[in-house]
């Protein structure tokens, strides 16, 4: 009887640990960087085109982004992911894209700027975009908001 009680306690503990692990945002959208590497120049695209999941919005963190800004601090995510974002902002080689569902960061991906440079977007106006936002990439692989882009 004691053996079964211990076993059931271990199962409950394992279920709790797995549920916490499952709540952590994961880099599940890594296929997006691969797709962006092959993105046709001057052809409109959205990140939704490359994702198997459905999110409400995306938040783009460019190099040297100030993670003390209110717009970032208001995002619901784990401390571990916030820490990762803080580290990533120190590199000018990457941008981090957060995928948001129901006001919570559910996934992220790290994009090398040589593949797609989101840092060329005017972030003084906006960091948060609808998931189906259309972008366009120029010859230098700089990404622009499609509706604001002119060749």
Each language-model region and where it sits:
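A mature extracytoplasmic/lumenal domain signature
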Residues: 64, 101, 110-115, 122
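Sec-dependent bacterial lipoprotein signal peptides
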Residues: 1-21
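Short, surface-exposed beta-strand/loop "edge" segments at domain boundaries and coil↔beta transitions
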Residues: 67-68, 105-107, 144-145, 151
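Short, structured surface segments that line ligand/substrate-binding pockets
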Residues: 86-104, 109
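C-terminal partner/receptor-binding element of secreted or periplasmic proteins
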Residues: 115-151
């Amino acid at each position: 009887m004691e053996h079964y009680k211990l076993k059931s306690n271990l199962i409950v503990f394992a279920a709790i640990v797995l549920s916490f692990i499952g709540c952590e945002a994961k880099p599940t959208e890594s296929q997006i960087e691969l797709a962006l590497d092959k993105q046709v120049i001057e052809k409109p695209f959205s990140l939704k085109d490359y994702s198997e999941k459905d999110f409400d919005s995306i938040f783009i963190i460019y190099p040297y982004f100030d993670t003390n800004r209110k717009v970032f601090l208001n995002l619901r995510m784990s401390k571990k992911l916030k820490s990762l974002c803080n580290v990533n902002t120190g590199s000018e080689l990457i941008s981090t894209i957060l995928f948001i569902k129901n006001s919570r960061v559910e996934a992220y991906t790290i994009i090398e700027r040589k593949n797609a440079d989101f840092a060329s977007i005017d972030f003084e106006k906006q960091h948060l975009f609808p998931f189906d936002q259309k972008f366009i990439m120029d010859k230098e692989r700089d990404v622009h908001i499609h509706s604001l882009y002119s060749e």
